[in-house]
């Protein structure tokens, strides 16, 4: 245009060119990423590669015997939980009735009182949502040990069993909550069991530190009522924040889960391919697994914080963030 001076132009390649000098974007990226590598070593040296992408399309969904216009959702807030308000807002926005129950642990009597309160309110709830955080300060070795111990209490265990087996209820756990569901056996087995070395687990990220970023996840199965408003193959952005999110299980078990549609979501790269690249699969999960379900799909666990969405967030990282899992859960009861 008249009066304007052209200072640069966009080309098809990924090089930055000034005069006779040319530098690749890959080289600049490496210089940026490696700046403090000698001080805080974190880069993975293994060659990144794509892994198998699973696909399971649901033909039908389970349905509760008793319908409910505004299902009640219990949200336990354990010592170290930091997502209960985000979770309650997401639940409320979807049309359900959230109730945050603070689990007190200052004294043994306080713990017992919390157990009794939760077990009592569980009898009239339709859903349980275990939010993320750093249960017990993630010590020792994190993975939601206090949450797991709480749910193994006889009264709470009985209430959860009744919710899932007799009242067609739903459960979900995100991040720390997912860790608890895994340790309890609720995913992938659908009930509280004594887990052993043959069960799947969530362990430390390969880079041995906390990861906090936006990742991309692909719907591998929409079998779960929580995912009934999604289509297999769709990709959603999701914020993650954890140090122990690496999903591990035997390949034999993973194949069985995939065959039954229990692998819900996988980390994917910019092309939508499941990958072990740490830039996209931040914890190096086997088969890039981000979330799994119980056999019937009514219990759902995932690492990414799908409750942390809202107007005005993540403006500088474009993508679809709304997996509509809470809306889908409410729809399940209508």
Protein language model features and the residues they cover:
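Amide-donor transfer/coupling interface in amidating biosynthetic enzymes
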Residues: 111-113, 118-120, 159-162, 194-334
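Extended, subdomain-level signal for the structured scaffold at the beginning of enzyme domains
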Residues: 56-143, 153, 227-228, 234-237, ...
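Intein/HINT protein-splicing elements and their conserved insertion hotspots or analogous self-processing inserts
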Residues: 1-72, 80
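Short, glycine-/Ser/Thr-/acidic-enriched flexible segments
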Residues: 1, 9-12, 22-23, 78-81, ...
């Amino acid at each position: 245009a008249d009066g304007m001076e052209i200072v640069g132009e966009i080309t098809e390649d990924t090089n930055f060119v000034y005069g006779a000098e040319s530098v690749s974007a890959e080289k600049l990226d490496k210089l940026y990423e490696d700046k403090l590598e000698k001080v805080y070593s974190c880069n993975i040296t293994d060659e990144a590669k794509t892994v198998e992408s699973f696909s399971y399309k649901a033909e039908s969904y389970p349905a509760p015997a008793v319908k409910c216009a505004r299902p009640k959702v219990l949200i336990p807030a354990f010592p170290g939980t930091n997502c209960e308000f985000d979770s309650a807002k997401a639940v409320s926005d979807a049309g359900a009735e959230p109730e945050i129950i603070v689990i007190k642990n200052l004294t043994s009597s306080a713990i017992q009182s919390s157990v009794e309160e939760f077990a009592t309110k569980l009898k009239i709830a339709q859903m349980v949502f275990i939010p993320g955080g750093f249960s017990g300060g993630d010590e020792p070795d994190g993975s939601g040990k206090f949450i797991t111990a709480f749910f193994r209490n006889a009264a709470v265990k009985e209430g959860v069993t009744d919710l899932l087996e007799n009242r067609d209820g739903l459960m979900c756990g995100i991040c720390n909550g997912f860790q608890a569901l895994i340790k309890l056996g609720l995913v992938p087995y659908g009930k509280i069991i004594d887990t052993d070395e043959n069960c799947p687990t969530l362990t430390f990220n390969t880079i041995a530190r906390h990861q906090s970023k936006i990742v991309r996840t692909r719907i591998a199965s929409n079998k779960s009522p929580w995912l009934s408003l999604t289509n297999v193959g769709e990709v959603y952005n999701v914020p993650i924040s954890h140090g122990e999110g690496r999903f591990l299980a035997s390949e034999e078990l993973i194949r069985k889960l995939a065959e039954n549609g229990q692998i819900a979501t996988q980390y994917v790269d910019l092309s939508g391919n499941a990958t072990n690249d740490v830039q996209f699969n931040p914890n190096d999960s086997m088969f890039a697994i981000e979330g799994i379900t119980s056999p019937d799909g009514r219990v759902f666990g995932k690492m990414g914080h799908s409750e942390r969405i809202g107007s005005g967030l993540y403006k500088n990282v474009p993508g679809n963030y709304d997996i509509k899992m809470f809306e889908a859960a409410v729809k399940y009861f209508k």
